[in-house]
C-alpha cells in the first residue's frame, strides 16, 4: 500500500507537492521521497486522467503549470524525450516548443495537456514511485 498522504493507481503511488521548485530540484526531491521516486511519468490515457484529477483536487493556486517527469534530453538532432524514471514515451500529449526542454501540465487546459516550459521556472509538481 501507499504511505498516508499518497494516492494509488495501478502499481504506483502519487503525490502532488505544492512547494514550488525548478524541474531539476523537483526531480531530486521526488527521488528522496522513495527508493525509485521520480517526477510523475504518464504512460496511458487512464493514468493521465488519474493524474489530472489528482492535480485538480490539490492545486488551487494561480500557478500556470505543474511539473511532470518529461524532459527533452540532448542537443540538436540528438534530442530524445524520455521520462525521468527512464521509461520511454509511448503515450503523449505534447505541445512543442524548441527552447523549452521540460514539461508541465497546463492549468489553462485543466491540466490535461503537456506544455514545454523553461526548466528553471519554479512550479508545483507530482511525484510517483512503484509500491
UniProtKB/Swiss-Prot annotation:
Domain C-type lectin: from-to ranges: 1-131
Keywords linked to the UniProt accession: Disulfide bond, Hemostasis impairing toxin, Platelet aggregation activating toxin, Secreted, Toxin
One annotated Gene Ontology cellular component of this protein: extracellular region
Family: Belongs to the snaclec family.
Disulfide bonds: 2-13, 30-127, 102-119
Function per UniProt: Potent platelet activator that aggregates platelets via both GPIbalpha (GP1BA) and GPVI (GP6). Induces a tyrosine phosphorylation profile in platelets that resembles this produced by collagen, involving the time dependent tyrosine phosphorylation of Fc receptor gamma chain (FCGR1A), phospholipase Cgamma2 (PLCG2), and LAT.
Subunit text: Heterotetramer of the subunits alpha, alpha', beta and beta'; disulfide-linked.
Top-rank taxon: Eukaryota
Organism: Trimeresurus albolabris
GO molecular function, one term: toxin activity
Main location: secreted
Protein name: Snaclec alboaggregin-A subunit alpha
Cellular compartment(s): Secreted
Entry comment describing in which tissues the protein is expressed: Expressed by the venom gland.
Amino acid at each position: 500500500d501507499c504511505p498516508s498522504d499518497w494516492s494509488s493507481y495501478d502499481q504506483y503511488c502519487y503525490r502532488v507537492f505544492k512547494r514550488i521548485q525548478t524541474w531539476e530540484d523537483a526531480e531530486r526531491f521526488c527521488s528522496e521521497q522513495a527508493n525509485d521516486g521520480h517526477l510523475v511519468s504518464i504512460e496511458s490515457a487512464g493514468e493521465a486522467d488519474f493524474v489530472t484529477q489528482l492535480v485538480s483536487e490539490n492545486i488551487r493556486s494561480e500557478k500556470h503549470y505543474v511539473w511532470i517527469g518529461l524532459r527533452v534530453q540532448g542537443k540538436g538532432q540528438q534530442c530524445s524525450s524520455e521520462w525521468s524514471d527512464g521509461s520511454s514515451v509511448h503515450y503523449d500529449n505534447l505541445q512543442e516548443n524548441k527552447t523549452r526542454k521540460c514539461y508541465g501540465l497546463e492549468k489553462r487546459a485543466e491540466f490535461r495537456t503537456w506544455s514545454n516550459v523553461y526548466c528553471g521556472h519554479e512550479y508545483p509538481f507530482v511525484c510517483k514511485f512503484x509500491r
